[in-house]
């Protein structure tokens, strides 16, 4: 299978093996070829945010003919029951900053729908059921849950609490929901793997270089296990 692997920042892509002289520049990004058993991989640092990740996802599908997308990276935890270093796979992905703003509150719609009137569909993009079963079988200890995506780096305890109360989500980040949206539009599956590097502003905790590196490595290792499960 040909799989596109996305990371947002250098520390996230650092652990992946990139074949020498395999880089190809498209749209201001360098796409590297690699292999994992029978899988052909296209690995790329997409950049931060929904626009970057959506653009690169489209290139992976259209230009490189990828049949699946996997994101590997870090996230901020918003579930009080989760701790730094825990890995989460996105079963549900919601773009929490997409919708209609009224009286200071945002009514979240499914990204891409006209944010007016009755919501036609649920806001979340859902992990493919067959892939979910394979991951659960091979990685029974890895948690699945809801990941929120927005174009904001969250370091605010009050907002963290509000997002958890509103969505019951486990983590917040800046790319996953957009990748899931693009993958769905092209009819291919997407898997978003995140390891908690910080707690999104809880108790004054700040993101450190050490926790970022450890989280990026844990996410990478989980992706390797997922690739094995997909053989």
Regions inferred by a protein language model and the residue ranges of each:
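N-terminal short beta-loop-beta anion/metal-coordinating cradle
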Residues: 1-64
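Active-site-proximal beta-strand elements of phosphoester/diester hydrolases
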Residues: 41-46, 146-148, 193
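Proline-aspartate-enriched helix->loop->beta-strand connector
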Residues: 66-70
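Mid-sequence, gly/pro-rich, charge-dense loop/helix-turn segments that line enzyme active sites
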Residues: 78-166
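Generic non-transmembrane alpha-helical segments
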Residues: 130-141, 182, 221-229
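A C-terminal functional module that forms or caps the active site or interfaces directly
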Residues: 153-205
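His/Asp/Glu-rich mid-to-C-terminal helical/loop segments that flank catalytic regions of hydrolases
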Residues: 200-231
């Amino acid at each position: 299978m040909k799989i596109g692997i996305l990371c947002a920042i250098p520390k996230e892509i650092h652990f992946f093996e990139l074949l020498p002289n395999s880089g190809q520049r498209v749209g201001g990004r360098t796409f590297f070829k690699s292999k994992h058993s029978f899988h052909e991989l296209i690995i790329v640092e997409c950049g931060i945010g929904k626009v970057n990740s959506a653009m690169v996802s489209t290139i992976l599908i259209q230009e490189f003919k990828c049949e699946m997308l996997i994101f590997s990276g870090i996230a901020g935890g918003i579930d009080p029951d989760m701790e730094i270093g825990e890995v989460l796979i996105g079963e549900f992905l919601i773009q929490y900053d997409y919708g209609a703003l009224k009286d200071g509150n945002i009514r979240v719609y499914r990204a891409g729908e006209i944010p007016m009137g009755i919501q036609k569909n649920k806001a979340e993009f859902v992990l493919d059921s067959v892939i979910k079963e394979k991951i659960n079988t091979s990685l029974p200890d890895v948690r699945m849950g809801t990941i929120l995506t927005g174009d904001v780096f969250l370091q605010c305890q009050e907002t963290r609490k509000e997002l958890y109360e509103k969505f019951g989500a486990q983590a917040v980040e800046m790319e996953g929901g957009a990748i899931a949206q693009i993958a769905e539009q092209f009819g291919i599956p997407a898997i978003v793997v995140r390891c908690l590097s910080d707690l999104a502003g809880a108790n004054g905790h700040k993101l450190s270089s050490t926790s970022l590196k450890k989280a990026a490595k844990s996410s990478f290792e989980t992706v390797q296990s997922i690739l094995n499960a997909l053989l």
